[in-house]
Design a protein with these regions (language model features):
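Cytochrome P450
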Residues: 1-345
Length: 345
């Protein structure tokens, strides 16, 4: 289904993100989708991501974790996972000189507006207010991005886009990248740490051999994808799994469900970092809308997990505050409270 964009499309007036940021690679299919996505393909390749952003991400992760190290306790989503996702995406888009709090404010406004549109913006005054605030946030972000497009810094992934897309098109796609790059990467890091700290045996394997961290991240993505569902819209009458679907029907795909398909994964509800086929997960979707930022998200998660385990000795969950992933669409723990040793050996 995710491969068949002709029958199940994202290009539909009900697509809430497009109402906020305009048409982008996320909300288009076919030739229009290809034209919007193509200029971003090279800068988002693994080698480009590593060359442009690995050193920055490593330094930023070290700074964030070192800042909390003396305290012996903390909440990792807000102290590390979220701030790292914000600063890396700001750097990636050429907004590295912008206050991260400002970038987060724009992001929060856009997210609230997308959620309001999805819930029918006119239904309540609160939704209408969120839509208005989101439009203002996107306008401010757009103004900053226009300056970047006019003179992109070398690290900006927008440097290769200039000329291939109009300024408005580049900005719409940058807005989508900001939205996805913060929300899902924050969840990806938080979920990976929750899974490791909840599984002492698997954690011991990683501590003994840090080369297993990428495998742990893939297994975490399988068990709890940060984006659990995606929507598609039927373009014609069809059948799917024995169900009759009419043209115009909205079809919600459960990525989380597919990732626990017992026909594909043995013991699918267990966290096993040595699972041989964990990478067959669909956490980054599939087909023409496979996540463009997958390499960047993996880089951030790998560095974040490695830095946390390296700098925070005897890292463990704070049992006074149970944590579990929450959310229908985007899933992550609301709080991830942990403790660690501050003793100097």
């Amino acid at each position: 289904m995710l491969r068949d964009a002709r029958t199940f499309t994202v290009d539909d007036p009900r697509f809430s993100t497009a109402k906020v940021v305009g048409p982008s690679m996320l909300s288009l299919d076919g030739a229009r989708h290809a034209r919007h996505r193509a200029p971003f393909t090279r800068p988002f390749r693994a080698d480009e991501i590593h060359a442009r952003l690995e050193a920055f991400t490593q330094a930023e992760a070290g700074r964030l974790v070192s800042a909390i190290q003396p305290s012996g306790a903390g909440e990792l989503r807000r102290a590390v996972a979220g701030p790292l996702a914000v600063t890396v995406m700001a750097e990636a888009l050429g907004l590295g000189q912008t206050d991260p709090a400002q970038v987060l404010s724009w992001y929060d406004g856009i997210v609230a507006a997308v959620q309001a549109e999805a819930a029918n913006a006119g239904a309540t005054s609160a939704n209408a207010g969120a839509t208005s605030a989101g439009a203002a946030a996107f306008a401010e972000l757009s103004a900053s991005l226009r300056q970047v497009i006019a003179a992109p810094p070398p690290s900006s992934l927008l440097a290769d886009v200039t000329g291939a897309l109009t300024a408005d098109e580049a900005i719409s796609n940058a807005g989508v990248l900001l939205f996805g790059g913060i929300e899902t990467t924050e969840g990806m890091i938080a979920n990976a740490m929750l899974h490791l700290l909840s599984s002492p045996g698997e954690l011991e394997l990683v501590l003994a051999d840090p080369a297993l961290i990428p495998a742990a991240i893939e297994e975490s993505l399988r068990l709890e994808p940060a984006a659990a569902v995606v929507d598609r819209y039927a373009t014609s009458d069809t059948q799917l799994g024995g169900a009759r679907i009419r043209a115009g029907d909205q079809v919600t795909v459960s990525i989380a469900g597919a990732n626990r398909d017992p026909r594909i994964f043995d013991d699918p509800d267990e966290f096993q970092i040595r699972r041989p086929n964990a990478s067959r997960h669909l956490a980054f979707a599939h087909g023409p809308h496979f996540c463009l930022g997958a390499h960047l998200a993996r880089l951030e998660a790998r560095i974040a997990v490695a830095t946390l385990l390296d700098l925070l000795s005897e890292l463990r969950l704070d049992e006074r505050y149970p944590a579990t992933p929450r959310g229908l669409v985007f899933r992550k723990p609301t709080d991830l409270r942990v403790r660690w040793s501050t003793a100097i050996s």
